[in-house]
Amino acid sequence: MDVGIFGGTFDPVHQGHLKSALAVKEALGLDQIVIMPNRMPYYKDRVGTSDADRLAMLKLATQDLNGVKISTWELEKTTYSYTFDNMVALTKEQPQNRLVFIMGTDSFLKLHTWYRGLELLSVTNIAVMKRPQNLSTAALDKANFLAELPAPLQPLFKQALSSNHHLSASTGELFMIDNPETDISSTELRHLLTQKRYVEATNFMDPKVISYIKDHELYSA
């Protein structure tokens, strides 16, 4: 089975997250997307919503989506771990599956600064959700895209970029996927929710999630 691994804090989950996940699933013909809420990264100094609340909101937001599964794999870990180590572990646990790690353009452009980031393709495939505001070029305009990459990423990009949206290997393939435009971020949504501007937030979030937030008084000032 071909499976996309989509990690994040999802604090809160919004339509941009879901549209992005489904865009990758459709573009690569994946059998399943596994949304994996993670522990709050060590570099985030903000006190986030509880794991239980983030998980509950994800379940509400995805309950009607076919081929989308929520995994608590990372939340169940007792310590924070690096993406490279996580993908090694997941690959060992799922030898029958071909995994694709899904990431945004902003994260990909910093991949060389991650722990063993330049080695990530040796243990998995990568799908980069190309955001129009980040890159001015078309998804597969290789020459122009290459010029915008940090130097450490250029050899990786040259070697791994797939010329089509067809998964053909267990590791080593890099895909650039056009990402539906999203007009809001989780940070901006938290600002709306803190001000109890729920009607505006409903433009970007599942109403069931909004109801959960109101009922549990999340993101209150």
Residue ranges and their predicted role:
Residues 1-221:
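Nucleotidyltransferase catalytic core that binds NTPs
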